Curated annotation (Swiss-Prot):
EC number in record: 3.4.24.-
Organism whose genome encodes this protein: Deinagkistrodon acutus (Hundred-pace snake)
Official protein name in the record: Snake venom metalloproteinase H4
Subcellular location field: Secreted
GO molecular function list: metal ion binding; metalloendopeptidase activity; toxin activity
Family: Belongs to the venom metalloproteinase (M12B) family. P-I subfamily.
Length: 357
């Protein structure tokens, strides 16, 4: 990269090697047509390592349910529910033109933010937010300064509660014509609400970007991940959130069965927390539990400033709920990739399920 050895602070953290690019939006609208802020399809051109890149994006229209709701709480404890218009959202997935194996997951809300794969390499892109608003940084994850070098792990072990496990994600694939849908509720606990200084717009953007990333990975299993609701515990936690992931998961499952399931139609609920779980654990979920009111849940620690890493942890715990166990030994997710169901989150880019691509 041209800026090797120089560092810059981005939302994703301190990046040491990066390239400044200027994405140019290519419009295909006929002359005189009214341009929407976030069109159904968009195309951007820029250069990476001196080579031209054409990024083709399509709006992720299946991101939200038709009756999507957002919930927060007033200081006196009243639940406040809104149904915002989300059709005009700014979350996209796509590919690089003339690269059949390429993928992209991009937020276009404030410049471009997300990641794309080209010629087997994954790059992240993020707006520099300078007075020159078109300037973006392109970088690899390996060039993000690590906050903590310790390995982070899923808390599911061989003796963790399970019904009938599906050994590999590939066993979930019935046929390419059989599309399935999973409606999920994301609950943001009070520690995470406080971490983002009560900025609900920032929290929503963080969560939506994660779900957009997850939906790309689950697409290869012919499962659409749809957000039914986002609930923020803005005043206080509605359960006892502990450093024990197991205790927190149990409490969250009981709360879902007693409360959440009776007011929001959904298949699965995930708790996002800024609480630092004991040991290396960053997530936990019941295995093969999708149809159980108390057990179709997971808990995920907001453990990184790199959205992609938290998103993959979330995708991992949802897969446990579906009945998928950890991958053992070697994993065929392509050169340079660790599979989503690896029990350890490390410094490699994590993208696919075993044998799903």
């Amino acid at each position: 990269f041209p800026y090797q050895g120089s560092s810059i602070m981005l939302e994703s953290g301190k990046v040491n090697d990066y390239e400044v690019v200027y994405p140019r939006k290519v419009t295909a609208l006929p002359k005189g047509a009214v341009q929407q802020k976030y069109e159904d399809t968009m195309q951007y051109e820029f250069k990476v390592n001196g080579e031209p890149v054409v990024l083709h994006l399509e709006k992720n229209k299946g991101l939200f349910s038709k009756d999507y709701s957002e919930i927060h709480y007033s200081p006196d404890g009243r639940r406040i529910t809104t149904h915002p218009l989300v059709e005009g959202h700014c979350y996209y997935r796509g590919h690089i033109r003339n690269d059949a194996d390429s993928t992209a997951s991009i937020s276009a809300c404030n410049g471009l933010k997300g990641h794309f794969k080209i010629q087997g390499e994954t790059y992240f892109i993020e707006s520099l937010k300078l007075s020159d608003s078109e300037a973006h940084a392109v970088f690899k994850y390996e060039n993000v300064e690590k906050e903590d070098e310790a390995h982070k792990m899923c808390g599911v072990t061989q003796n963790w509660e399970s019904y009938e496990p599906i050994k590999k994600a590939s066993q979930l694939i019935v046929s390419t014509e059989f599309q399935r849908y999973m409606e999920i509720v994301i609950v943001v606990d009070h520690s995470m609400y406080t971490k983002y200084k009560g900025d609900s717009d920032k929290i929503k953007a963080w969560v939506y970007e994660m779900i957009n990333t997850i939906s790309e990975s689950y697409r290869y299993l012919y499962i659409d991940i749809i957000v039914s609701a986002l609930e923020m515990w803005s005043e206080k936690d509605l359960i006892n959130v502990e450093t024990s992931a197991e205790n927190t998961l149990k409490s969250f499952g009981e709360w879902r069965a007693k409360d959440l399931i009776h007011r929001i139609s959904h298949d699965n609920a995930q708790l996002l927390t800024a609480t630092d779980f004991d040991g290396p654990t960053i997530g936990l979920a019941y295995v093969a539990s999708m149809c159980d009111p108390k057990r179709s849940v997971g808990v995920v620690q907001d453990h990184s400033s790199v959205n992609h890493l938290v998103a993959i942890t979330l995708a991992h715990e949802i897969a446990h709920n579906l009945g998928v166990h950890h991958d053992e030994g070697s994993c065929s997710c392509g050169s340079g990739y660790t599979c989503i169901m690896s029990p350890v989150i490390n410094s490699e880019v994590i993208k696919y399920f075993l044998d799903s691509k």
